Amino acid sequence: IKYVKSFILEKDGKIYNEFHSMSYDDEASLLYLGSRGGYGLVRFNLLTKKYEFIPMNNAGNRAVGDVLCMCYSKDSTFYLGASSGMTQMKLHSGNPAEVRQYSRIDGIKNDMVHGILEDSDGCVWLSTNKGLTKYNPHNRFFHNYESPDLDVTEFSDDAYWKCPYTGKLFFGGINGVIWVDPQN
């Protein structure tokens, strides 16, 4: 390592440096950071070194801004997992973000979302404390997978990965690892 630079991110006089997830937009040299502590998503420009906290449009629900995991989809939509469910957010240049919040009431098996992956069909898979949920953003339908379908039902933070060669989705939990082949 030849060079290391750290950044302290502040908002309203408070320091927010606890991040649990990241995503990168190569075309724009933007790094998106999932923040804990109520401020949600941070957009960091790697060229200018400037950052901004992106409003989550739900000040009444502090947990929405407590991002545990993130997925940046092929259609440039953010899916953010939190202790209160999933937030689907589309950013628009110069306009407020389009935000939808989903929880158990909407069909997610459990509100504690530990991991989010997109499959090759554009569906989003959520690992939760009570099983897996597949979300189809085209029709907003949730399908839940739980015992006896799964050997692992309680998943862990940051224990998810998509194989770039096969498209298989892997999720780790407190009693093992499962993989999903969305094509079969």
Q: Model features per residue range: what roles?
A:
Residues 1-184:
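Carboxylate-rich, polar loop motifs that coordinate divalent cations or form catalytic acidic clusters
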